[in-house]
Amino acid sequence: MANIKSKIKSITKMQKARARNNAIKSRVKTAIKKAKIAISTDASNKSDLIAKAHSEISKAKSKGVFHKNKANRKISRLNLFANTYTTPAQ
């Protein structure tokens, strides 16, 4: 444990930020998982869940939790997953 007052404060701040970031990452993972399940089962609300997942990813990007390239990659992969399930196999 740190003995210096400023380091104690910075550790506390880092712990709060880590908890906040982990909560945001968890929301993103849950939204993606729900969207993928809806796409796989061809649920009626799949477009809403895809939009919600895109929104959560964009929020994480704007808050600095995800790098812009990582956020774009996640969105792209979700769209690719949706397109492979919705287009008929030829």
From Swiss-Prot:
GO terms for molecular function: small ribosomal subunit rRNA binding; structural constituent of ribosome. The keyword Ribonucleoprotein applies. It comes from the Bacteria. Keywords: Ribonucleoprotein, Ribosomal protein, RNA-binding, rRNA-binding. Pfam families: Ribosomal_S20p. PANTHER family: 30S RIBOSOMAL PROTEIN S20 (PTHR33398), SMALL RIBOSOMAL SUBUNIT PROTEIN BS20C (PTHR33398:SF1). This is Small ribosomal subunit protein bS20.
